[in-house]
């Protein structure tokens, strides 16, 4: 039975099989170069796919965690978690946003990014990779819309999130994704946003970031 055919009867489908299948599809969309759209971050292709997984397996997380946990504990070697520096303060990014609703979306996404970044840095080795995909499923639909519209502030947050993947390059399906995404985002937002907000990300991607907390910077 294909996943498409199984979805209408997903209550009857074995939850672990549905979770694994949908996760493999998300990884495929993440890794496959054929889904890349010119001039647009590839994250905008795989974010919606990844965000659909929790909805598919809603109500079955305890079963999935129990059955799949032993297999998920076998992780290939990767860079030490301590090589990922603390996330700089990004709250000033919201300055200049006049619409309270839009500002709230940025603030919430920033809060979720800080949470996801800290979870990723502290995660045990077997769950380190999985923790890197926490932020996309935590942000709101409203923030995802801002990303799709290429709003500079949203793309700045996306670039900071993408820096996580610079420490996961040993995985064949991740590779140089962090660098590729950053280059696309830099072109979209322009020199001013790049200079003020993306220098730290560039340093992380190139392995030059300090372990000290980044300095807060203002921006329009």
PLM regions and their residue ranges:
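C-terminal effector modules of eukaryotic transcription factors
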Residues: 42-220
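Hydrophobic/aromatic-rich effector regions of fungal transcription factors
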Residues: 1-38, 160-167
């Amino acid at each position: 039975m294909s996943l498409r055919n199984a979805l209408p009867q997903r209550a009857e489908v074995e939850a672990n099989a549905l979770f694994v299948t949908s996760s493999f599809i998300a990884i495929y969309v993440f890794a496959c170069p054929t889904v890349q759209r010119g001039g647009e971050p590839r994250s905008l292709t795989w974010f919606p796919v990844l965000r659909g997984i929790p909805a598919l397996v809603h109500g079955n997380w305890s079963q999935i965690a129990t059955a799949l946990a032993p297999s998920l504990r076998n992780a290939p070697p990767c860079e030490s978690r301590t090589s990922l520096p603390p996330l700089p303060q990004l709250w000033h990014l919201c300055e200049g946003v006049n619409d309270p609703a839009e500002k709230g979306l940025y603030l919430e996404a920033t809060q979720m990014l800080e949470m996801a970044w800290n979870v990723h840095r502290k995660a045990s080795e077997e769950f380190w990779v999985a923790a890197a995909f926490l932020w996309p499923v935590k942000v709101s639909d409203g923030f995802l819309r801002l990303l799709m519209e290429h709003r500079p502030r949203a793309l700045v947050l996306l670039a900071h999130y993408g820096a996580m993947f610079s420490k996961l390059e040993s995985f064949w399906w991740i590779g140089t994704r962090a660098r590729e995404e950053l280059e696309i985002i830099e072109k979209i937002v322009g020199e001013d946003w790049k200079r003020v907000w993306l220098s730290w990300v560039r340093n992380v991607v190139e392995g030059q970031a300090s372990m000290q907390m980044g300095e807060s910077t203002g921006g329009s």
